[in-house]
Amino acid sequence: MPLVEQKEETAADIQGLRLKFPGAADLLFRDLSVKILRGEKVLLLGPSGCGKSTLLQVLGGMIPRVTEVPMKAARLEVPESVGFVFQDPETQFCMPHVDEELAFVLENLAVPVQEMRPRIEAALRQVGLNLPDAHIPIGNLSQGMKQRLALASALLLEPETLLLDEPSALLDPEGRRTIWEAVRNVSDRRTIVIVEHRIEEVIDWVDRVIVFQADGSLVADGPAESIFRRHRNQLREYGIWYPEAWSDAYAPITESKSPALADPIEDQADCPNSSAPRLESELQPLLRLEQFSVLRGGKEACRVDSAIVLPGDLIAVTGPNGAGKSSLLLGLMGLLPRRGLCRYGEYLPEGRRAEREAAAKHMAFVFQNPEFQFVTNRVLDEVSFTLRSEAEHNLQQERRGGSARIGWPFVRRGRLTAEDEGKIERRALEFLHRFGLADYAERHPYLLSLGQKRRLSVASAVVSAKPLLLLDEPTFGQDARNTFAMLNLCEELRASGHAVLMITHETEIAQRLATRVWRVENGKLVDDRSTARSCTDGTRLVMGDADETFF
C-alpha cells in the first residue's frame, strides 16, 4: 500500500514584499519572501531597525489594515487568528485597570460573565503576575509587569498564531523564565513567531531561525543549531546576538585609562574628579544618600539607608520587577517626592526647588520608556534641544551672576549667536553619527524602532555631559553591536571622572562591568556590594576588529 504524503499546512506566506515608510530614503524590504508553516516556532534575528517588528505587523495584518504603509507583495497570506504582544506593552492596552483589560478580551469572545473571573485569575497566574487585587490601575504597574499583562491578554484569545515582539525585554531573570514557560505550555499546535534579542530562553525550543541584515534582506534561514554554528561570523559581523557574543566581546583593560577611552567627548568642560587620584579612598563622592526615601502616592516606594556614588563608578541597580528601582532613579532626579539627605559633592540642597535644580545640574536621566522624554518632531532636534537648553540656562545664570552648569562646552557671550547655533547643530550631528542615527536625523522620533528610540534618548542625555548619568534599562531592545557600543560609552564616561547608575536585568553587565551592584527588593536597597572592578579599572567590549567604533 503506497504511503500517502501528508501536506504541510501554511500559516503565513509572504512573497515579493516591498515596503517603504513615508519619509524613508530606501525600501525596508526588497522582494522579501517568507513562508511559515502551521505549528512552527520561528525566531527572527537581526540588527536593531532591520524590520523585524515591521514584519510581525505585516504577519499580524496591522500593516496595511491599521497602519497605512506603502507596500506591494506578489502574495500576502497571513493568519486569521492572531495574538500579538507589542514591543511596547502600553500601546496595546485599552482599559485603565488590570482586570478590566483582561475582561475586555473575554467580552470580545462572548465569554459569560460568571466564567470571567476564574479565567482572568488563571491567566495572571500563568504569566506570574501575582497581584493582591486585580482591580489595580495599569499605570501603577512596572514596565515588566505590564509586559506580563500584555502576554496574558494575548493568551486569553487562544489564538492559532502568537506573534511576540520582545515579550521579555523588561523582565527580571525569573520573570523571563516564567514568561517563556507560559509560552511553551501553550505552544502545542500553535504557530509562534518571535522577535527577541535575549535568545538564551528560546533557542532550545524554536524550530527555525531567520536572520536579517540591516537593510531588511534575508541572510540565513534554518534550524537554530545550524544557524549559530555555520553563520557565527556573519552574526558577529552584523552585530546580532548569538550564544557566545559576550565571551567574544569582553576585553578587560589593565591600565586605568587607555587611548581608546581617553578624552571620549571633545570640548567637554572638566567634570569634578576628572583628574582625581586613583585610590578610591581618596575620591570625593559625586552623590551621597543617607536615610533617603522616595514616595509614590504618599507611600514609601524605595528606601536607601546609606549609599555613595564615586567618580568612575558603574553601579548596576538590580532586583525583581516592581521592587522600586525606577522609583529610586525618579526620586534622585526630583521627579517624585523624596525625603532624607541627598548630597551632590559638597552641596546639600535645601527645599524642593533647590533639590530639583541640583539634580538638573549634576545628573542626566534616561527613562525606561524613551518616548517619555521626546519633546520635538525631529531626531536632530532632540539632541539639539538638550544643548540649546544648557546654553540658555547658562546665559540666564550669567545674567544673575551665578555659575553655569557643569559640562557646557560652548562659549557664553550673553546671548546665543548664529555661530553658537551652528556649533549646536554640528555637535548634535556628531552624536547622531556616534549613536548610529545620522541617517534618521530628519525623521520623527516616534517613527524610529524601539532600539533606535532608546539610543536617541541616551544620546540626548549624554550630550549634556553631566557628572552622573542615570539609565533605566538602557540596553533593552538593542542588538549586540549597539549594546556593546553603549557600554563602551559608559566606560569612556567613567574614564573621564563621570559615574553611571544603571538599572539592568542583564546579569552579564552586573558581573563583568559593574564596580558596585545595588540590589533593590520590596522597596528597599538591601545590598550594596563591591565587585572585582574598581572605579579606575577599564574595559572595552568589541565585535569584529578591536579598534572598530560602532556608534
What does each of the following model-derived ranges do?
Residues L155, A461-V462:
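ABC ATPase C-loop
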Residues D172, D479:
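ABC-family nucleotide-binding domains
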